[in-house]
């Protein structure tokens, strides 16, 4: 596709150029909304921020176009440049740019075999660490650095409270949870017993380390009927460790929903006032 000429100050041409200028750090995703890269993750942001970015971009374009018009003695170009500071022009360019970005919508958190951590990206297949890139399109990040071979006396002590016959199994399941893949047995673990068996300490530590990869599941997701609003399921989009803290007295699990969550590679839901989106 041909690039618009630098002296083409139509809304369409300006939006094309503005989209090229921001697409490395801005994205628009179906069913999610507008996102901006902060150096570690892509975060959902208000559309007003794109309008503000368009304002500063058009201010620079206006200055350059005005200088060019004066050198040429081009009164038409000079007049066109003046309108780039108008609220309507700024809003129109931002709106068109959002559509251009949506037309090139990326897939978020797509690679199940890598983990975004504070000091880079871990390849879970090899244990190697690499630099983070915007094109990874992470929306989640662990709260800790990756340090190969690291040990913690507190963690070792917490594990000792877990019954010995289930200790290694629990460690494997929690480790597997950091991948984006469904467990081989397609089951949902339930941790039961009194308050002295280490379950709260172990889950608390893992959830804290997993950062935004860990979520607390709302009651309605597992207890509600199938007719509940689909926004509930969006709480686990991109999550790798989902914890349902405690079954309320008299509560009944939705068996069909449990089976779906444990064995389905793709789920569908939507945020409030957004379109449905399918995610892994």
Locate predicted features:
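Acidic/polar loop patches that form or flank catalytic/metal-binding clefts of enzymes
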Residues: 1, 214-219, 252-255, 267-272
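Charged, alpha-helix-enriched surfaces in structured cytosolic catalytic cores
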Residues: 13, 49, 169, 201, ...
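Short, well-ordered loop/turn and helix-capping segments at boundaries between secondary-structure elements
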Residues: 180, 208, 212, 249, ...
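Active-site proximal loops enriched in glycine and acidic residues that flank catalytic Cys/His/Asp
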Residues: 193-195, 206, 246-251, 271-273
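AAA+/SF3 P-loop NTPase mechanochemical coupling elements
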Residues: 231-237, 270-280
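Conserved AAA+/SF3 P-loop NTPase catalytic/coupling segment centered on the Walker-B
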Residues: 238-263, 276-277
């Amino acid at each position: 596709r041909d690039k618009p000429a630098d002296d083409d100050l139509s809304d369409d041409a300006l939006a094309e150029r503005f989209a090229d200028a921001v697409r490395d750090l801005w994205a628009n995703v179906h069913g999610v909304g507008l996102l901006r890269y902060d150096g570690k993750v892509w975060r959902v942001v208000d559309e007003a921020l794109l309008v503000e970015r368009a304002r500063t971009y058009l201010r620079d374009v206006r200055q350059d176009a005005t200088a060019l018009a004066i050198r040429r003695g081009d009164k038409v170009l000079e007049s066109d440049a003046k309108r780039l500071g108008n609220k309507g022009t700024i809003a129109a360019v931002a709106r068109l740019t959002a559509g251009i970005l949506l037309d090139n919508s990326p897939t978020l958190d797509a690679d199940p075999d890598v983990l975004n951590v504070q000091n880079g990206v871990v390849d879970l297949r090899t244990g190697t660490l690499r630099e983070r890139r915007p094109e990874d399109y992470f929306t989640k990040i662990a709260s800790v650095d990756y340090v190969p071979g690291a040990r913690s006396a507190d963690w070792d002590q917490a594990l000792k409270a877990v019954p010995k016959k289930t200790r290694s199994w629990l460690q494997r399941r929690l480790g597997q949870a950091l991948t984006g893949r469904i467990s081989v047995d397609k089951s949902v673990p339930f941790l039961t017993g009194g308050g002295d068996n280490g379950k709260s300490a172990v889950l608390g530590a893992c959830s804290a380390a997993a950062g935004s990869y860990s979520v607390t599941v709302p009651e309605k997701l597992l207890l509600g009927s199938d007719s509940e609003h689909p926004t509930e399921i969006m709480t686990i989009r991109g999550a790798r460790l989902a914890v349902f803290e405690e079954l309320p007295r008299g509560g009944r699990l939705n068996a069909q929903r449990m089976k779906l969550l444990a064995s389905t590679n793709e789920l569908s839901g939507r945020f409030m006032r957004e379109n449905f989106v399918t995610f892994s």
